[in-house]
UniProtKB/Swiss-Prot annotation:
InterPro entries linked: Bact_metal-bind_prot9, ZnuA, ZnuA-like
GO terms assigned for molecular function: metal ion binding
Biased composition (Basic and acidic residues): 129-146
Annotated residues for binding of Zn(2+): H62, H153, H217, D289
Encoding gene per record: znuA
Disulphide bonds in the chain: C262-C316
Name of this protein: High-affinity zinc uptake system protein ZnuA
Function: Part of the ATP-binding cassette (ABC) transport system ZnuABC involved in zinc import. Binds zinc with high affinity and specificity and delivers it to the membrane permease for translocation into the cytoplasm.
Signal peptide coordinates: 1-28
Length: 318
């Protein structure tokens, strides 16, 4: 009986500890709002702290509803990294409970703000451009994402990714100064890797630079400008519902008139929607994944993400 009581007390104590902090085993982590930020953070925090992504694959940063367990993860994190309130408005309130030195809003960094693109901004002087025709007609008014004055898809900019990596390095150095050598080495490796990767992507994309295309999400401006691609514009289409006959006619007319080579959807689009858009034209259809769903977080994941995106462009435009 005595043995049983002792076991019961131990079990109750263990339960109390878990209730006090259900994430006590993984409390010291770098937590990012979305997967691509996790790619950058994982490269810098490699061998220092684990990196976790708050949003599950398939969830939208525009309208995610935090669970109590998510709030706990934010509070127990060593560092929280997000784009900023224009992209992840749902984080603004819970992050008031997190110390300022334990969070980074990347879009607000002094090193990043000069690199921000205005919404719908493209480099019109870019060679090979035939102009950008933006189609804003909607099948679903909630489907187009506006982030205010600036394009907030900043993880698609290698230049901003580099500044993000430096900021993450510097903050982790403040929080864990004992890891200086490892953090310094990680940052040097990331910067070298990024520079080499950019050279490879320039070579890969050169043959398709003058080929026009449309997208279903106005997210890619940073990547397109950086690598000299030729977007013709974007259509706003509900990923779940096939557009009506009149809308399809409008889209197909633009595809043909502007001599588009390809129209790109994203992983959340149903195949029937994608097929319906390009049907009856010679325009190919492809898929771009701006969040890198399925790419494992490790020290190579950001460059793997950029390479995957480049391959997705080339596979449809070549």
């Amino acid at each position: 009986m005595l043995h049983k009581n002792k076991w019961l007390k131990q079990a109750m104590l263990a339960s109390a500890l878990l209730l006090a902090n259900p994430f006590n085993l993984a409390s010291a982590a770098v937590v990012t709002s979305i997967r691509p930020l996790g790619f950058i953070a994982a490269a810098i925090a490699d061998g220092v702290l684990p990196t976790e992504v708050l949003l599950p694959d398939g969830a939208s940063p525009h309208d995610y509803a935090l669970r109590p367990s998510d709030v706990q993860r934010l509070r127990s994190a060593e560092l929280v990294i997000w784009v900023g309130p224009e992209m992840e408005a749902f984080l603004s309130k819970p992050l008031t409970q997190v110390a300022e030195n334990k969070q980074i809003a990347l879009s607000q960094l002094p090193s990043v703000t000069p690199l921000l693109m205005k919404s719908d901004e493209h480099d019109e002087a870019e060679e090979g451009e035939s102009g950008h025709h933006h189609d804003h007609a909607k099948d679903n008014p909630t489907d187009d994402h506006h982030h205010g004055e600036y394009n907030m898809h900043i993880w698609l900019s290698p230049a901003i990714a580099k500044q993000a990596a430096i900021a993450i390095h510097d903050r982790l150095l403040e929080l864990t100064p004992q890891n200086k050598d490892k953090l310094d080495a990680n940052l040097r490796r990331f910067e070298y890797q990024l520079a080499q990767n950019e050279k490879n992507i320039v070579t890969m994309l050169k043959p398709v630079q003058g080929k026009g295309y449309f997208v279903f999400h106005d997210a890619y401006g940073y990547f397109e400008n950086h690598f000299g691609l030729s977007p013709l514009g974007h259509f706003t289409v509900n990923p779940e519902i096939q557009p009506g006959a009149q809308r399809l006619h409008q889209i197909r007319t633009q595809l043909v008139e502007h001599k588009a080579v390809c129209v790109f959807a994203e992983p959340q689009f149903r195949p029937a929607v994608i097929n319906a858009v390009a049907k009856g034209t010679n325009v190919r259809s492809g898929t771009l994944d701006p969040l890198g769903s399925g790419i494992v977080l490790d020290k190579d994941s950001y460059v793997n993400f950029l390479s995957q995106l480049s391959n997705q462009y080339v596979s449809c435009l070549k």
